[in-house]
Every structure is written in C-alpha cells, then in structure tokens.
Amino acid sequence: MTLLADRAPAKVNLTLHVLGRRVGDGYHVLESLVAFAGTADRLTLDPDAPLGLTVSGPTAGPAGPTDDNLVLRAARGLAARVPGLRAGAFHLVKRLPVAAGIGGGSSDAAAALRLLARLNGLPLDHAAVGAVARETGADVPVCLDPRARMMRGAGEEIGAALGLEPLPAVLINPGVPVPTAPVFRALGLSVGQDLAGAPHPTIPQATATDTLLQALAGARNDLEAPALTVAPVIGDALAALRAQGCRLARMSGSGATVFALFADRRAAVRAAAALRAAHPGWWVAPTFLR
C-alpha cells in the first residue's frame, strides 16, 4: 500500500489569557484564540510495516527519544481503544522547533491520529479518537482539525472553526527551548486563585483582518511576562520583529517562539530575510496563519 502523508502545522496562540487555576486538578484555566501556520512538520505512515517511528529533519535531534514521542503515544493509545486497529511505521520530518510554544509535538500527535483514522475509516469525531487526543496532551484536541478557533479551560473546550482571512506572518524562535512548567511556575498562581485582567474580546465567526487586529490589540498573552524571566532573549526577538514595521508582535504559548503580523505577504518575506541576516542562529519562518 502507498504511504499516507499529512502535515502537522505550527499552532500559534494569537491570544492567551490565563483566567486562574482551578481547584481539584490544579490546571490553569485559559482562554485563547489559536491559528495554524503554513509552516509544518510532515508525517508519513507505511501501513505495511510494524508500528514504529523514525525521525529526520533539521530539528530531529532536540525532539528526543522516539519511544517517548507523542506520535507513538497517540498510536498506542488508539490501538488500545480500537480492537484490530491497523497501524504501521511512521516517519516524521521535524522542521518545527521543540519546546517552542507552537504545539509541535501536539500537532505531530494529531497528524498521527488523522492518518490512523484515515487508514481505518474512522471519522475524526469518533469517541476513541477524541479520548486519545485528550489523553495524549492538552493541545492535541485543537490540533486534530487545524483551523483557527477559540479554546478554553485546560484545552478541553474547543470552539467552532472561525472564518479568518489568511494572516501574513513571521515566526521567530531564538533557539532557546522553554519548557511550559517553569513559565507557569513563574506566573505564580496558587490553586483556586484567579488572575485579574480585561476579558477576552469576542471574535465573530467571520472577521475581517482589520477588525481582528483591533480585537487582538485589546488582548494579550499572560504568559509573556513570566516567560521573559525564564528566557530574556524572547524580549530581543519581539523587539527585532517590531523593528520590521509589523502590525502586531506577540509571544505564542509559553514561548520562546514569537510571531508578528504584517500588512501583506511581501512585507513578511522582506522582514524574514532581514531577520535571518541579522540573526543567523534564529529559526525564522515567513508564513500565513489561518
């Protein structure tokens, strides 16, 4: 049988409001507008080979041991829930930076679930697919159908897909991995504590870019300030983006990746070229978010 293939796009938090930390499980309660980039990892599945995973690509090294990769965790989880599930050998071409605040591992796991669902004739809203997505990681469910939408809670409340116009953007990672846990520790919320702040703006189902940018200007990423204490270079990356004349610059997730929105594709490509020349050690990607 021929190989099955899918993309695992970067997930970008255009906003990320932390509402508090809930009693019971201690999870932080979030409200976030997420979009997905044209920049992506690539995952293939060979159904004629035994279950396994190989990894190549420019960021394969930092991705860590394959046995603990979320791709295999998702595949094994689905096999445990669906008797007779056909699987196979996965190959991941890793292009996205690791521990970078853009959900690379979660998107890879979601791509694995899509490939297995396609191979076995399962709809993406199959109960087992959704359950395994939730078990594999908080960001995996929103990555199953990678289109812009609101997500809330600890990732379990996912809104309908939004009809955003494609947003010309540049993503930058300054080459410093930033695990999520230290950033949340730096935020310093106790269990049961709420975080004061302006409410998240309402994002209509279909939003013109200028209207969206006005809404984004009234929003924030509450993890940006604590992430700067963990990795101050994030501030340098944001300053470098703002110097290129962008319309908005912000950190994604818990960092260290930052993004900027530009007036058009040409401006984004021009800014990316200038940033690569000035910072050859940084990961820089002109793209669209949608």
Swiss-Prot record:
Protein purpose: Catalyzes the phosphorylation of the position 2 hydroxy group of 4-diphosphocytidyl-2C-methyl-D-erythritol.
Binding site for ATP: P97, V98, A99, A100, G101, I102, G103, G104, G105, S106, S107
GO function terms (MF aspect): 4-(cytidine 5'-diphospho)-2-C-methyl-D-erythritol kinase activity; ATP binding
Catalytic activity from the UniProt record: 4-CDP-2-C-methyl-D-erythritol + ATP = 4-CDP-2-C-methyl-D-erythritol 2-phosphate + ADP + H(+)
Family, similarity comment: Belongs to the GHMP kinase family. IspE subfamily.
Lineage: Bacteria, Pseudomonadati, Pseudomonadota, Alphaproteobacteria, Hyphomicrobiales
Involved pathway(s): Isoprenoid biosynthesis; isopentenyl diphosphate biosynthesis via DXP pathway; isopentenyl diphosphate from 1-deoxy-D-xylulose 5-phosphate: step 3/6
Enzyme Commission number: 2.7.1.148
NCBIfam families named among the record's database cross-references: PRK14608.1 (NF011202)
EC class (word): transferase
Protein name: 4-diphosphocytidyl-2-C-methyl-D-erythritol kinase
Alphabetical list of InterPro entries matching this protein: GHMP_kinase_C_dom, GHMP_kinase_C_sf, GHMP_kinase_N_dom, IspE, Ribosomal_Su5_D2-typ_SF, Ribsml_uS5_D2-typ_fold_subgr
Gene3D superfamilies attached to this UniProt entry: 3.30.230.10, GHMP kinase, C-terminal domain (3.30.70.890)
